[in-house]
């Protein structure tokens, strides 16, 4: 007897696995990832042949959107999934530049929403009870954002509410705003990290201990503790998200004729800090 699935999940990387863990207790999840090479995950059947992907009403897209050589965001895998599959409702969790969902809806005539992901690969345990998204468990997130036409976002809110319950905020907006908020967040975190790197150098030049300075600064609750640790041997920011996303939003708004001077300086300062401390 053929197994009946509720939701198809495209992509089983870090974000895809978090979405799978979130949904699995309430829905039958069909996973498709032809490039998955990780360890087997108990309870997850990972399909690699697109021809045997069953049609489900809902599909969640969690595929990579890497940075191209010209620093733009490569959305080709997302677009391929949506154009070459057949589902009633799509939710994109991959980070994509503003305007992508709107363009895909126009070109494919499909019902697509976007939801920024808040799953992180950081090294530190984040106290989710302090208004921060839990780094690995979406069931502990206190908000979920859905962008798109209201008829489509309402469907996805219904899917999510059956898992998350009544406690979180379910915010609905247009897709471009939902896409941009992810870039605003990561650009702010990158800027804050460079700001703290700069003040580390300022403190050093004045004979002041940065960690002592930092703790006094953080007595003001408006500052926030994230991104304030500085390691002399590894300065600036790195990883899979911040460099990619800051570069991508810079390139995207340049296409609209705007010069994001602050973010460009953040990238230049980051390169300087990285070059000075890495072998």
Model-derived features: positions:
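Conserved beta-strand termini and adjacent loop/short-helix elements that scaffold enzyme active sites
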Residues: 32-34, 47-49, 113-115, 172-175, ...
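Rossmann-like NAD(P)-binding element
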Residues: 46-89
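Interdomain hinge/lid region at the active-site interface
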Residues: 175-179, 190-279
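Short-chain dehydrogenase/reductase
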Residues: 146, 150, 185, 189-193, ...
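Short glycine-/acidic-enriched loop or helix-start segments at secondary-structure transitions
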Residues: 19, 41, 70-71, 100-103, ...
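Rossmann-fold dinucleotide-binding core
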Residues: 63, 87-89, 95-178, 249
């Amino acid at each position: 007897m053929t197994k009946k699935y509720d939701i198809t999940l495209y992509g089983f990387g870090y974000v895809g696995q978090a979405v799978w863990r979130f949904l699995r207790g309430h829905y039958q999840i069909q996973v498709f990832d032809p490039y998955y090479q990780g360890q087997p995950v108990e309870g997850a059947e990972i399909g690699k042949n697109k021809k045997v992907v069953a049609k489900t009403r809902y599909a969640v897209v969690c595929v990579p959107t890497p940075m191209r050589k010209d620093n733009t965001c490569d959305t080709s895998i997302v677009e391929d999934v949506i154009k070459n599959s057949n589902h009633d409702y799509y939710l994109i969790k991959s980070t994509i530049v503003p305007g992508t969902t709107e363009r895909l809806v126009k070109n494919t005539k499909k019902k697509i929403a976007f939801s920024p992901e808040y799953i992180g690969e950081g090294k530190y345990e984040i106290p989710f009870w302090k208004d921060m998204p839990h780094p690995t468990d979406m069931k502990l997130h206190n908000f979920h954002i859905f962008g798109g036409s209201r008829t489509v976002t309402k469907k996805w809110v219904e899917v999510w509410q059956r898992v998350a319950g009544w406690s979180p905020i379910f915010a609905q907006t247009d897709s471009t705003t939902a896409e941009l908020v992810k870039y605003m967040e990561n650009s702010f975190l990158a800027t804050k990290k460079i700001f703290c790197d700069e003040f580390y150098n300022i403190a050093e030049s004045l004979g002041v201990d940065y960690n002592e300075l930092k703790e006094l600064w953080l007595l003001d609750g408006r500052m926030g503790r994230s991104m304030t640790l500085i390691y002399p041997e590894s300065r600036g920011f790195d990883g899979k998200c911040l460099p990619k996303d800051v570069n991508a939003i810079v390139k995207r708004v340049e296409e609209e004729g705007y010069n994001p001077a602050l973010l460009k300086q953040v990238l230049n300062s980051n390169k300087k800090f990285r070059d000075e401390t890495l072998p």
